[in-house]
């Protein structure tokens, strides 16, 4: 978890912090804890959350995290409740996730996370589809069944996409921009050339994933490209604000 801090001391992150407006730098804090109980984070203090919640196949890595899909959803309900508490009014929480195939069964993770977040007070603002390169996966045993049995009813596609779910706590007060120093407001402007050239304005983003290369420090950790949080931070936060 990443929140505003200075030399290990927590700061008030309920509003843009004037101490960082001059240098436009970033301050980082890592908390090893449980997202179901984020007591370290003040209420209404987070301006943007970008997270990849535990995938439903996480028990392969964390066998005690949940025993079945109902327990998985219970975990997400607890996380959603805490996220609603720590999120400032009008601000955004983003989840990168997708439906999951486990032991031959497909689970509707995207729709269930959406329902859980709405039930915990968030508005469902939008969904962006993250498409990975076609070369990310070759024909697998799943999709390759058609090669062995080229008949109807044998089709199971390989997945090269995930969903970026965007939720909002209430409505954003756009008069907030008037309260920001001009330097902060102008420094937070979105690069329109990049916005147009890389098609940020579409509901489909083509972004190369991080390959799980042998010897990588992150081996075994979800391949999560930095480009996704970079875009979301640019689109949904201002300089001096707090990102979780």
Where are the language model's segments positioned?
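Core catalytic lobe of class I
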Residues: 1-244
